[in-house]
């Protein structure tokens, strides 16, 4: 039964992608404005439904102006989860671009790929600057990796410099907490529970195998906490700004865990 369900889900994943991808490619030829995020958002919503990912929203995303959404990171599935409500471009590590299927699909949401290579640094800085100048909102995962969702590790501050450049004076930063609430229709308790949704640095499971295992499950319930926006104009030090955002995201996870245990 689980294998049949997983097969149906993977077939639906393929069919939905085959419908949306050509249309999105055509749209991107003519426009990369806010309208170019509509189909990816529909794709994310459809796939969350197909894979049984239920999302609870606490708070509201800041959409009144250009915003950098700063979130903890548990899994490649976070892309779908956040994509259901945020019309923004992801900033991802360069190796994501080479992932089978997901690498290609991520480009359809105008993802900016970055690396630690000095050779690529200037080109990547130009790409990010262009996105900021074009008033695009961004989604970043400043932990620099993914975790099993138990804690939020310290943020790397480098990407926060985007919001502190003198020529950028009207960018808000909104901390966002992702928290697993339930997997397979029960509370998250064991490491296996965490690893059903999370795909993190301490795992050796290939992406495809992990997705298949998740497809065989009863899905997951994920909470998204949108915290109070932070005005980048009030900061001049990216490390302090990163620490402030980390505290908001980390406290959000701690409070969620306390609430669910009561």
Predicted segments, located by residue:
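Generic beta-sheet signal
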Residues: 65-71, 136-142, 171
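A cross-family acyltransferase "interaction/gating" segment
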Residues: 102-103, 150-236
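Catalytic core of membrane glycerolipid acyltransferases/transacylases, capturing the structured
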Residues: 20-30, 35-36, 49-50, 65-119
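A transmembrane-helix-recognition feature enriched in membrane-embedded lipid enzymes
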Residues: 1-57, 104-108, 219
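Membrane-proximal, solvent-exposed terminal domains/tails of membrane-associated proteins
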Residues: 227-231, 235-236, 240-242, 250-262
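Short histidine/acidic/glycine/proline-rich micro-motifs that form metal-
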Residues: 29-34, 145-148, 231-232
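Surface-exposed cleft-lining segments at the edges of enzyme active sites
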Residues: 110-117, 148-150, 195-198
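Soluble extracytoplasmic domains of inner/organellar membrane proteins
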Residues: 128, 132, 136-140, 144-155
């Amino acid at each position: 039964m689980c294998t049949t369900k997983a097969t149906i889900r993977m077939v639906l994943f393929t069919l939905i992608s085959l419908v949306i991808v050509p249309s999105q490619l055509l749209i991107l030829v003519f426009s990369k404005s806010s309208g170019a995020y509509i189909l990816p958002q529909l794709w994310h919503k459809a796939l969350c439904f197909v894979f049984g990912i239920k999302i609870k929203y606490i708070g509201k995303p800041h959409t009144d102006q250009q915003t950098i959404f700063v979130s903890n990171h548990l899994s490649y599935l976070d892309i779908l989860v956040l994509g259901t409500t945020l019309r923004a471009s992801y900033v991802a590590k360069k190796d994501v671009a080479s992932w089978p299927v997901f690498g290609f699909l991520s480009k359809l949401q105008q993802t900016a790929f970055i690396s630690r290579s000095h050779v690529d640094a200037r080109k990547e800085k130009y790409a990010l600057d262009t996105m900021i100048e074009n008033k695009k909102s961004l989604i970043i995962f400043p932990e620099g990796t993914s975790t099993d969702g138990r804690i939020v590790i310290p943020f790397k501050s480098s990407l926060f410099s985007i919001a502190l450049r003198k020529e950028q004076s009207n960018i808000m930063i909104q901390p966002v907490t992702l928290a697993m609430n339930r997997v397979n229709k029960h509370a998250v308790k064991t490491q296996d529970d965490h690893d059903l949704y999370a795909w993190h640095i301490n795992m050796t499971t290939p992406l495809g195998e992990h997705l298949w295992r998740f497809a065989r499950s009863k899905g997951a319930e994920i909470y998204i906490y949108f915290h109070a926006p932070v005005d980048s104009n009030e900061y001049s030090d990216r490390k302090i700004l990163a620490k402030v955002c980390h505290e908001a995201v980390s406290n959000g996870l701690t409070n969620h865990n306390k609430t669910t245990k009561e």
